[in-house]
Amino acid sequence: MTVSLEERLLQNLAAPRADTRSVTPSIRAFAQAIDRQRAGLERVPLLAGARPDLATAARRLEEAEVAALAVELDDPQIELAAVSDVARASAVPLLRTDLLLEEFQIYQSRAAGFDAVLLVAAHLPDPVLARLCSAARSTHMAACVACATAVEIARAAQARADAIALPAAPAIAAELLAALPRRALILALTSGAPEPKHLLGRADAALDRALGAAADPAAAFRAALAEED
């Protein structure tokens, strides 16, 4: 994440609050889109919300048959409008991955067209984590909870997370895999391009920063798939 905790708190203080009555439920199922039953690994390109060609990159990735897209926002008040344009034209679900700390951000995300949100367990006390997961469910969004310890995985399960996001450097630690609830949907978090050989059979999908940062993400996506065949 490129925005610090302190920066996001300041942004939140100045952010307008969406009227929750006008927020419509998501109809694009992120969890279903990435669920490969561990038979394969879905790459989810992570695009920067400030990317000048965001709409074009998203459209071309959809044409390349990505299962889902992720977007990270540095300045939501500026970048959410571009996400809304993408969401209106997209048939694939959108995951928001930047720092979410307050309930209003969940409704803000859905109002912009996101279908899933990434929540970081380390930044959210139990009551807040439960409230944000509940808010996501109320709008039919998937709540993906990023966990770095077995304790955080247990907290995510208690909050009824739709998916567990785990660090992969390049593999997911055995102790984290052992702590997962049965049939948990797993999203691997990598610092660059995921390595399928380390993740196949262990994760359903992986955020791919390298694809999202490429000059032509769709071409990079197709090339990555060709290498796996």
Task: Map each language-model feature to its residues.
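Solvent-exposed, charged amphipathic helical/linker segments at domain boundaries
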Residues: 124-133, 145
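Residue-level preference for alpha-helix termini and adjacent loops
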Residues: 99-100, 123
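C-terminal active-site rim and adjoining tail of enzyme catalytic domains
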Residues: 167, 187-229
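Conserved N-terminal beta1-alpha1 strand-loop-helix module at the mouth
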Residues: 1-94, 101-104, 135, 139-165, ...
